Structure formats: structure tokens, C-alpha cells
């Protein structure tokens, strides 16, 4: 965060980018700060986001998909929906952009030390959960946590993000990695079935556990009752919200849900907190 | 005016009691002096609050389309024409609309009264025939109605409603007596540079609150051009070109449809004389196309029809 | 200068001129039905007889359009943003009403929250602007500051509070900057310290005027009993789910008059603009009344209709802000929205409706409510 002026982005360059899906609606950008000192001082936590800035076009709040354990480059997976994101999709390696952040509160992973962690991801909402998983599985952190379960689903195989990462987890014995698609498909070697169904099969015990849940509304709607049936309390479940944002620091007044600003008090909220806020999101 | 209020209440209570309408859109007393508030009465008891004073400004047709159901609307001449407008523009069905026709003797301009009071606070206004009595903590002054009438009411050409399902009073003289085309001379006499200077000066105090747009019954686009971001048609800053572009574009969208009701001018918190634009639009439509907006449900709007002998002159 | 000083009313222009050394001095001026802060011109003099300005003075610290950053669009520096430097202009606003001053104090807490959320533009302008208030001796019908933790002679947010005593003006310092400012005034004109018999009389007169002003508000049909008490007790979910909102919203035009004239509304939009080889990132006042305010690029909008947006405004003022600011209402009772709303939607009535509905609404089924009487 630029101390003198929180509206001033740090200059950065696009290192490389690739489209994640055949329809090219999602593009993962690898970004490097122009100034190594900035890179060193940019300390972030899984679950935080940054405002990606293109001077002349505007800014877009994007979750940080990389983990701080992966070095000073940042990964952002951008969905092309409007003016700024279209311009982000059109960037070429070497092009300049701005990064303003880190913003938001991030997942409360340090507070969950000692617990079993269940991660439930659907569609391209998996972006900041990639950051959480990579962080958790880093040798410096893994031993501080109990069982780690990763449940991730998409409509079809080509819509699954980051196969280079989760395929590696499949072979590990310190993580239960379940990747699923909606309907059976030739050549698919993992699970078939909606995410809530897989969650039900896993039936994670509530005792000493916490869950990070990010996905489309339908997935959330059917997954939360599974947790409830297993005796999970709202304080144990964490979700990440999105909203239209501008300042990103809780001043411009636009992204609030109830008395909480998604950009500053969130984007991560426990289910218990969300239950106290008006459901206006 | 008291007789008007009585009649409106009678009609509204009957329509609601007989369940001929779901709601009656009219006015009730304002919470501050010199104001009347738009009000939706849904029961005969609520209809008892309906009133009619010289401060029933704004244009109820603006709210009519959004309320849904079968609606009765208290409408003077200009409002009734805008009701024709929203029916023609498919925002409301004629069969869902009951027009409570209110022949209008012209509305009062609270700002004119305030200016004449030179800082003394007004606590009440009484309207009796042609006299308007303004009272304060320690004063009482009487004006002729014409002295404090709204400008567009002075030059109104259609004071009797063009639609009427219920009638509140006998028809009144159709025009306000003033010469509407005299206002146009403000523009006509000037060369283009001087016109631009007047245009710029008129909107110097604009704060882009969009009250003019939101008070206007013509502005019912699902997404206003101002709210588009891809592409974005105009800047949102206070830079002069952006402010002027907004007003210019909106004026062109209203051209040929504007009834010069003055709701925009009443709504503007900065007191901008919006009518400098709307009166010109109205006059140009009459002069160039022989058309006055929304006088009947059957007449086609001037700019929605092409005829080979249309004048080449554009709205200027 | 620690204590208050009494000056002759006729000396005020001279004092303002003295304060104008190195500063731009603004005073309220009335033209027709509009009152606005304008640059003080000694030749035009000034009047202490005005209600309040049509627009709030927040634009002095939070301009409607403000450039945040600049950048080049071409060349090796393309895309590199630089902070827009603020001018060194010092200002003094004379005639700020206590309600607007309280709004400045409230906005201080919005624009300067903590290390991460400090707006340098507000902070700098605030530091460079001195506020001399004018106590209210004759509140307007629409004033209700006393119901919003304020008062006609309150000093919160001001550097000096002036009180019009007729032939004399009492200047009361509030802050250290105010004390220094008062010393400057004492150099320009003869100020009698407000102590002893003479001082006591003046202070007594000011007190009488204060009580008179409060009595005027107490006599308003809207003010007595107007309180946030029940709203603060109930959960935000309960207040949000009250059945009153559709009726309140149905005649609202969803324009931006209330938000733009309001001294505590602070929402803004950030946009980029380019022209040729250069560009700027600029912020503009925005309004929660607009559909675009919360519209996601995907097309989803958490506040899709007028009802949600109208509810948001009143929830923000009377529930969310007090929750975040230790109970301080988000409204200062200046009455501008009441006077200027084209549809005459009266915030005092809305609060009363919220209050009554909160007293009788049953406990929220989903979560235990804080206190239901």
C-alpha cells in the first residue's frame, strides 16, 4: 500500500499470460513489480485482492491467486466482463500496468492453526483458494494444520483452472484432493458429480475444523446445508464476497454489505458475520 | 383550490371504495411551507389526505409508470399530456389508467415568493381566488397570483387536461395569457457565439444531480445514456464540456416530446432556469413541425414520423 | 488568545480582511433564493442574516471533481501514475453553521480512518482550511440538529464560534488554531475579553439565544421524541427487513439532490480520462441513488430497484454509520434534504417511521436480536 497516497498504484509489468479456458473468458496474468523494493515490501495474505490499474482505462479488483510463498511475482486470474478486464485481456508481455494493494482482510489462516481445513471451490471462484492451498501446503505451514481437504468442481474438464497445481496435490498423502466435473466425460480420470454431492461424500467432521467456501450461488446454496447437517457452526465457515468497488480502502462508500465494507472488512467473512448482515449481495 | 381538493378526495374515495383502481396518485400537504408532496393513496381513508394547492408542482406522470396496477392520477393539462406520452411509449396501458382531470389555473413558484421575502421565513401561504397571502412569524403580505406564478404556467397553452376519465371542475380558459414565443426571442435574437455564451452561463451552477432528468416523465429509458460505461458517452466531472453535453443530449432526447411542464426547473436545487431549453424545444416543435406533444393518444409524435416536406432546419 | 472576545459588529469586515492575509476568505452570500459561499469582498460587505447555504460547504474539503493522479499515455512514461499535487492555498470559511461543522468532524473520521485508509487529499485540505462558525439564533423550520447529537451553538469541528449578539459579535476560540486566529483578530480590531460584568452579560446573551434556538426546534412538530434509540437497539437485519421501505420509496425520484446537498454524504466514483498524450484519474461525487452505483460488470446488481437504494441511504445514515462511529448519527440535522427534495421526502418522517417500526417489530427469527422491548 502506498503510504503517502493510497490511490497511487505500484508500477508493474506483465511477465506472461495464458488463457485458462477454451472460450478465452478467463486469463491468468503473471505480474512483476517494476521496483524490486516494492516487490520485497508487498506482503500479502491468501484471500486478499489488489486493484489492477490500467492508466486511461480504470481499475478492477481482482483476487490474488498466487501464494506469498511463491516468490515476488503475483498471479491474477481475470474474467473478461467489462472495459478494464477486456483491456487486461489485451495486454502483451512487457506491458505496464499498476497494482494497488494488498487490499482486504484475507483468510484468517493464522487463527485457524491446529485445525483441519476444508476448502470447497466451484468454477472460477477458486482463484484465491489456490493462494490459500499453496500457502497451506508450503512446508513452513503444513505442519501447523491438521487434515487438509480440497474439493473443487467445474462444469467440464476444460473449465477447471490450475491443473498444473492440483494434479500435483493428487499424488500427495498430506492432502485429500477431490476434483470433480458435473457430468461424465470421456477421458476424465477424476470424480463426477456436483460439488455439494462430493462434499457430502467426504463428510468432513466439524470438530476442530474450518472451511473456506467460494463458488457460484447455486453451489453455495447446496453446500451450506451439507455443513449444517454435519454439525458445523457458522463461525467455522468462511466465504469471500465480491462487490462493485472503487477506492478499495473503505472510504468511497460503495461496496458495503450492511455496515461492513467488502473491500476493507472483507472480502472474507465468516458465515456467522454474514448472518448478521442484510443479504444484499 | 379548496373546492378542487374536496372534489379530488370525493372522486378518489369513490374509485377506491368501488375498487375501480388500486391506487390514486395525487398530492398531500408538504412537510414544509410552500410544498405539496406526491402521494399514493390506496384506501378511502388515505384518500382523505389528498389535496390540491398552487404548489402541486413536478409531474406525476413521472411516477405513474413505475407504480403498477390500476392507477388513477390527478392531472392538470401538462401532466395529462405526459400521461398520453407514457401510454404511447408503452410504459403504461390506457386501460390501467384513470385520469382525474384537474383544469389548472397555474402553479406558484416558491422561489419567487422566497426572493420577495428578502430572507424573512415563510410559515404559510393562503390562496384565495386571485390573491396569494404569504405569512411569516411577524408579517403578512398579499400578492396577485400572477406575480408569483411559475413562468411556464404564465405561458401555458393547454391548461385543460387532454384526457379525462373523472373531472374535478369546469374547464378554464385554455391559455395562461402569456406569450410563450416571447421567451424564444431570448435565443432567436442572438448570434451563435452569444447563444453558446447564454447556454454556458445558464448551466454554470449545475451540480449533475440529475434531478431534472429524474423529475421528467419523458426520461424513462431502462438505462440512461449517462449510466452507460461501455462505451461511456460523456465524462462525469464538473468540467464544462461534460456538464453542457449532458444537458444538450438530454434536450435532444426530449425534443418533440417535451410539454414544457417545468418539472425540471422546479426540481433543480441550484435554481437553474431549465425552461430556457424546454421552452425552445416546445416552440421549435410547433414552428418546424406544427406539432404539440401528446395532445391526443392518436397523434403521432413529430420526430417519429418522416414526411418528405419536413423542414431541413434542425432543433437549434 | 484563550478566552472569548467581544467585538463590535461593525468591525467584522475589518477582521475578515485581516484574516485574509495569506488566506482566501469565504462568506455566505445570498442571491435570490440561493445562498452560497463566495470569496469575501470588503467592498460588498457581508450579512449575518442568512439561513444556510443551498449546498453544504463540504466541497471545500471534498471538491465535486478532484484529480487524484496524472499519467502520460504515450512514450516511455506511459501508464506511470503521479499524485496530483495540491495547491498551497490556505482558506478560511466564515459563517459555517454548527451542523455543517459537525459534519466536517464526522467526515474526518470517514476520510482518515487508520494507516491504510487515509485520504491525503482531504487531510491536506482540512489542515489548510480554518473554520469560523456562526451560531444559529433562529433555526429554520426544517432544522433538527438537536435530535442528531448537535446543537445550534455547538462547537464540534470549528476553530472559532461566532455568535451574533446584535450590535456585538462574540468570538469564542475552540482549537489552538482558533486561539491563534483570534489573536490575529485582536490585532485588527478592539476586542473586549468576555469576562467580568461586561463579559458575563455578553455570555449570558449568547446563552439566551442558544436556549431560544433550541426552543424553536423543540416546538417543531418533528423534533420532540425524534431519536435513534430503537433503531440502534435492533439488529441491522431487522431494520433492513422492516416493511416501511416500499412505501417510503414509492414517491422518491432516485435523483441525487439529497446526496449532493448533504454535508455528510461522501460517496465518490473514480474515473480515468485521457486526451491525446496525457490522462488523469479523477474522482467525482457519486450517489447511492443511482442504479450504476452498485452494478457489477457481470450485470448483477445487489440493489436493482429504487426500494433497495432508498433503504440504503437511510440505513447508512441511521444504522451503519452509528454502528461504525460509536453511536454518532450519520445525519447532522441541517435540513437541506428536507428543503430541496423534489418529492418532499422528509428524513425526519422516515426516521420516525423507522423508530416506530423498530419498537414493534418482532425479534428476528434468524439471529437473536440485541434487545427487544
Question: Predicted segment positions?
Answer:
Chain C
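Iron-sulfur-associated redox domains of electron-transfer enzymes in respiratory
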Residues: 1-236
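Active-site-flanking alpha-helical
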Residues: 104, 263-267, 342
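Ferredoxin-type iron-sulfur electron-transfer modules in oxidoreductases and energy-metabolism complexes
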Residues: 225-250, 268-373
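Extended amphipathic alpha-helical segments enriched in small hydrophobics
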Residues: 248-259
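A donor-sugar binding/catalytic signature common to diverse glycosyltransferases
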Residues: 257-273
Amino acid at each position: 500500500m502506498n503510504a503517502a497516497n493510497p490511490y497511487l498504484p505500484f508500477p508493474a509489468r506483465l511477465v506472461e499470460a495464458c488463457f485458462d479456458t477454451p472460450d478465452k473468458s478467463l486469463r491468468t496474468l503473471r505480474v512483476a513489480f517494476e521496483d524490486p523494493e516494492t516487490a520485497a515490501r508487498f506482503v500479502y495474505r491468501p484471500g486478499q485482492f489488489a486493484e489492477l490499474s490500467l492508466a486511461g482505462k480504470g481499475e478492477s479488483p481482482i483476487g490474488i491467486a498466487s501464494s506469498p510463498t511463491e516468490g515476488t511475482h503475483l498471479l491474477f486470474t481475470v474474467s473478461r466482463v467489462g472495459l478494464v478486464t477486456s483491456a487486461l485481456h489485451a495486454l502483451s508481455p512487457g506491458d505496464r500496468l499498476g497494482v494497488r494493494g494488498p487490499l482486504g482482510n484475507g483468510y484468517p489462516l493464522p487463527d485457524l492453526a491446529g485445525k483441519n481445513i476444508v476448502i470447497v471451490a466451484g468454477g472460477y471462484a477458486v482463484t484465491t483458494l489456490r493462494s490459500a492451498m499453496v500457502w497451506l501446503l508450503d512446508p513452513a505451514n503444513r505442519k501447523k494444520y491438521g487434515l487438509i481437504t480440497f474439493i473443487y468442481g467445474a462444469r467440464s474438464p476444460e473449465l477447471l483452472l490450475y491443473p498444473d497445481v492440483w494434479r500435483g496435490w493428487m499424488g500427495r498423502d498430506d492432502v485429500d484432493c477431490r476434483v470433480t466435473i458435473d457430468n461424465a466425460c470421456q477421458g476424465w480420470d477424476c470424480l463426477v458429480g456436483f460439488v455439494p454431492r462430493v462434499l457430502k461424500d467426504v463428510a468432513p467432521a466439524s470438530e476442530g475444523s474450518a472451511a473456506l467456501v467460494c463458488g457460484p450461488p447455486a453451489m453455495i446454496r447446496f453446500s451450506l446445508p451439507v455443513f449444517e447437517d454435519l454439525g458445523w457452526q457458522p463461525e467455522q465457515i468462511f466465504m469471500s464476497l465480491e462487490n462493485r468497488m472503487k477506492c478499495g480502502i473503505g472510504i468511497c462508500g460503495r461496496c458495503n454489505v450492511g455496515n461492513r465494507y467488502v473491500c476493507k472488512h472483507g472480502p472474507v467473512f465468516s458465515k456467522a458475520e454474514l448472518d448478521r448482515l442484510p443479504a444484499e449481495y | 383550490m379548496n373546492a378542487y381538493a374536496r372534489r379530488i378526495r370525493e372522486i378518489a374515495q369513490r374509485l377506491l371504495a368501488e375498487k375501480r383502481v388500486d391506487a390514486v396518485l395525487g398530492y398531500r400537504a408538504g412537510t414544509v411551507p410552500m410544498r405539496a408532496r406526491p402521494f399514493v393513496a390506496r384506501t378511502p381513508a388515505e384518500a382523505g389526505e389528498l389535496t390540491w394547492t398552487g404548489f402541486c408542482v413536478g409531474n406525476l406522470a413521472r411516477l405513474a409508470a413505475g407504480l403498477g396496477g390500476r392507477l388513477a392520477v390527478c392531472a392538470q393539462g401538462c401532466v395529462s399530456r405526459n400521461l398520453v406520452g407514457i401510454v404511447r411509449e408503452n410504459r403504461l396501458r390506457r386501460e390501467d389508467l384513470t385520469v382525474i382531470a384537474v383544469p389548472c389555473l397555474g402553479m406558484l413558484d416558491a422561489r419567487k415568493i422566497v426572493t420577495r421575502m428578502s430572507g424573512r421565513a415563510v410559515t404559510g401561504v393562503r390562496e384565495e381566488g386571485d390573491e396569494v397571502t404569504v405569512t411569516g412569524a411577524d408579517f403578512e403580505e398579499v400578492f396577485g397570483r400572477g406575480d408569483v406564478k411559475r413562468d411556464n404556467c404564465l405561458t401555458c397553452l393547454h391548461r385543460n387536461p387532454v384526457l379525462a376519465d373523472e373531472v374535478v371542475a369546469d374547464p378554464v380558459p385554455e391559455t395562461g395569457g402569456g406569450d410563450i414565443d416571447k421567451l424564444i426571442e431570448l435565443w432567436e435574437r442572438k448570434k451563435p457565439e452569444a447563444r453558446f455564451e447564454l447556454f454556458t452561463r445558464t448551466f454554470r451552477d449545475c451540480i449533475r444531480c440529475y434531478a431534472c432528468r429524474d423529475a421528467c416523465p419523458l426520461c424513462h429509458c431502462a438505462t440512461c445514456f449517462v449510466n452507460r460505461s461501455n462505451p461511456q458517452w460523456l465524462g462525469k466531472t464538473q468540467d464544462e464540456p461534460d456538464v453542457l453535453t449532458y444537458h444538450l443530449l438530454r434536450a435532444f432526447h426530449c425534443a418533440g416530446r417535451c410539454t414544457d411542464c417545468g418539472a425540471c426547473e422546479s426540481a433543480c436545487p441550484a435554481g437553474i432556469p431549465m425552461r430556457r431549453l424546454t421552452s425552445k424545444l416546445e416552440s421549435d416543435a410547433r414552428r418546424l413541425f406544427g406539432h404539440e406533444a401528446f395532445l391526443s393518444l392518436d397523434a403521432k409524435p413529430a420526430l417519429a414520423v418522416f414526411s418528405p416536406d419536413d423542414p431541413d432546419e434542425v432543433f437549434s | 488568545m484563550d478566552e472569548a472576545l467581544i467585538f463590535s459588529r461593525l468591525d467584522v469586515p475589518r477582521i475578515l480582511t485581516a484574516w485574509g492575509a495569506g488566506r482566501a476568505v469565504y462568506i455566505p452570500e445570498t442571491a435570490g433564493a440561493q445562498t452560497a459561499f463566495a470569496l469575501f469582498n470588503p467592498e460588498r460587505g457581508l450579512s449575518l442574516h442568512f439561513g444556510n447555504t443551498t449546498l453544504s460547504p463540504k466541497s471545500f474539503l471534498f471538491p465535486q471533481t478532484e484529480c487524484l493522479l496524472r499519467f502520460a499515455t504515450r512514450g516511455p512514461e506511459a501508464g506511470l501514475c503521479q499524485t496530483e499535487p495540491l495547491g498551497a492555498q490556505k482558506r478560511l470559511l466564515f459563517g459555517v453553521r454548527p451542523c455543517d461543522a459537525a459534519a466536517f468532524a464526522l467526515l474526518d473520521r470517514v476520510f482518515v480512518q487508520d494507516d491504510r485508509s487515509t485520504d491525503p487529499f482531504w487531510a491536506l485540505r482540512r489542515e489548510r482550511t480554518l473554520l469560523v462558525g456562526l451560531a444559529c439564533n433562529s433555526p429554520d423550520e426544517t432544522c433538527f440538529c438537536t435530535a442528531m447529537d448537535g446543537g445550534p451553538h455547538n462547537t464540534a469541528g470549528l476553530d472559532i464560534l461566532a455568535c451574533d449578539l446584535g450590535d456585538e459579535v462574540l468570538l469564542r476560540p475552540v482549537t489552538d488554531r482558533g486561539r491563534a486566529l483570534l489573536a490575529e483578530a485582536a490585532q485588527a480590531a478592539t476586542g473586549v475579553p468576555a469576562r467580568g460584568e461586561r463579559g458575563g452579560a455578553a455570555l449570558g446573551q449568547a446563552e439566551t439565544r442558544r436556549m431560544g434556538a433550541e426552543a424553536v426546534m423543540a416546538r417543531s412538530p418533528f423534533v420532540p421524541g425524534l431519536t435513534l434509540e430503537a433503531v440502534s437497539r435492533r439488529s441491522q437485519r431487522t431494520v433492513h427487513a422492516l416493511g416501511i421501505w416500499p412505501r417510503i420509496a414509492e414517491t422518491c425520484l432516485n435523483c441525487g439532490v439529497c446526496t449532493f446537498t448533504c454535508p455528510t454524504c461522501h460517496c465518490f466514483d473514480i474515473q480515468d480520462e485521457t486526451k491525446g498524450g496525457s490522462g488523469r484519474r479523477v474522482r467525482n461525487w457519486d450517489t447511492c441513488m443511482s442504479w450504476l452505483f452498485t452494478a457489477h460488470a457481470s450485470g448483477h446488481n445487489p440493489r436493482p430497484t429504487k426500494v433497495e437504494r432508498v433503504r440504503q441511504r437511510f440505513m447508512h445514515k441511521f444504522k451503519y454509520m452509528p454502528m461504525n462511529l460509536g453511536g454518532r448519527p450519520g445525519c447532522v440535522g441541517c435540513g437541506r434534504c428536507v428543503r430541496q427534495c423534489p418529492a418532499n421526502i422528509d428524513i425526519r418522517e422516515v426516521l420516525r417511521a423507522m423508530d416506530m417500526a423498530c419498537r414493534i417489530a418482532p425479534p428476528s427469527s434468524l439471529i437473536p436480536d440485541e434487545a427487544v422491548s
